[in-house]
C-alpha cells in the first residue's frame, strides 16, 4: 500500500507501522455494477489522540485536512477541534456511516455524505434540497447515478449530473470524488468547477476495477472534461 502511494507521488512520511497489528483491509464484493464492502480496521483503529499530538506541528502547516470515519470517531473529532481552533479548513467524509455531532458539523468546512449517510446524520424529516439549503457551501450530498448536489450561498441548489460511463466497479468512486473535489478547491476553483471536475473523476474511476487502481490521473480527468465540452 505504501509503495503504491509513493509511486503515485503521495507523501508517506507519517505512515507508521504498529507492531503486532495487521494493516486495515476492505473486502469488496462486486455485482451488477455495485459493491458491498466489509472493513477490518486493523491499524487504522490505532490512530489515536497521542498519534495526532505527535504530528501536530506538521498538521498545523497544512492548507486543508481531509477526514473519514475510517479511524476512531474520537480521533476524528479531536482533529476537527484542533483544525477549527487554528483556522485550517476541514473536509469530513462521514464514511463508514456514523452520527456526526452538531458541533462537529458546524466546525467542518465541508461535510460530504452520500444519501444514506445524510439520513443517519440529519434524520428523515427533511428533503435533500431542504438539507442543502440549511448548510450552503458546507453540505455536499452524493447521489450515485444522479450525481452530486450542494447549495450555493446565493440560495441556488446546484446539481451536477454524472458523466456517462461504462460502469465496471463503483468501489472507490466516493473516495475519488472527495479527493478530486478537495484538490480543485485547494487550487482555487469555484464550488461548481470543483464539483464538475470531481464528478468526472469519480465517473472515470467506475470504468476500472479496484478502489486505488481505478482512480484516474489529473491528465485523464482533464481529457474527459475537454471531450465533454466539445
Predicted regions and their residues:
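Conserved beta-alpha-beta core of the PfkB/ribokinase-like small-molecule kinase fold
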Residues: 64-130, 146-147
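A residue-level structural signature of the nucleotidyltransferase/glycosyltransferase Rossmann-like core
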Residues: 44, 110, 138-140
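Short, hinge-like loop/turn segments at secondary-structure boundaries
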Residues: 4-8, 31-34, 85, 107-111, ...
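Structural motif corresponding to alpha-helix initiation and N-cap regions
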Residues: 24, 49-55, 73, 97-99, ...
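Conserved phosphate-binding/catalytic region of the ribokinase-like
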Residues: 99-103, 126-230
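Conserved N-terminal subdomain of the carbohydrate kinase-like
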Residues: 1-63, 221-230
